[in-house]
């Protein structure tokens, strides 16, 4: 008897280096262009960030793209184009959230997308304790939603707290 597990795509999870976090905080402090009209969700504030001289892209993101391509294949190869194109950072923004803010399931455009948690305003344990159903729902979670081999909707939850500071790189078309 053999067990067959079909291949599937995944995502990367990694902690940023202190100098990368410092660079992002500097970008956030300088941000002043409203991104909310182009985004979904009930969020306190969303601002576009400017990656000066592509520092964050060149130092951090391109490495994650390479690691992802090594493990799961270069997803950019699947996009029909007339020639080769360099990876670039199309848009970059910060969501400043407060207690009770939320972002509904959505997806992003492009080949790759990422999220970086820098300062989590809540703790999932506290949020779970205050839910009426107390069923460990989705309060203070970050979730991926996808279908399994049977077509059933499946989720993968990140339960967020102060310890969650880190980075995840994931495919743009996966629902979050």
Label for each model-derived stretch:
Residues 90-170:
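Catalytic core of non-heme Fe(II) oxygenases with the double-stranded beta-helix
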Residues 1-86, 91-103, 138:
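Non-heme Fe(II)/2-oxoglutarate
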Residues 175-176:
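Conserved small/polar residues in nucleotide/adenosyl-binding loops
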């Amino acid at each position: 008897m053999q067990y067959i597990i079909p291949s599937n795509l995944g995502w990367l999870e990694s902690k940023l280096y202190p100098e990368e976090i410092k660079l992002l905080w500097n970008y956030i402090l300088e941000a002043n262009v409203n991104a909310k009209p182009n985004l979904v969700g009930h969020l306190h504030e969303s601002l576009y960030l400017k990656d000066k001289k592509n520092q964050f892209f060149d130092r951090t993101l391109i490495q994650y793209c390479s690691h992802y391509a090594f493990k799961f294949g270069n997803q950019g190869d699947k996009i029909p184009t007339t020639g080769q194109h360099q990876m670039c950072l199309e848009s970059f923004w910060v969501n400043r959230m407060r207690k009770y803010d939320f972002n509904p399931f959505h997806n992003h455009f492009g080949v790759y997308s990422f999220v970086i948690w820098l300062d989590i305003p809540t703790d999932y344990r506290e949020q779970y304790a205050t839910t009426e159903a107390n069923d460990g729902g989705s309060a203070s979670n970050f979730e991926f939603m996808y279908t399994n081999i049977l077509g059933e909707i499946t989720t993968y939850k990140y339960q967020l707290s102060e310890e969650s500071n880190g980075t995840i790189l994931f495919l743009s078309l996966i629902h979050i």
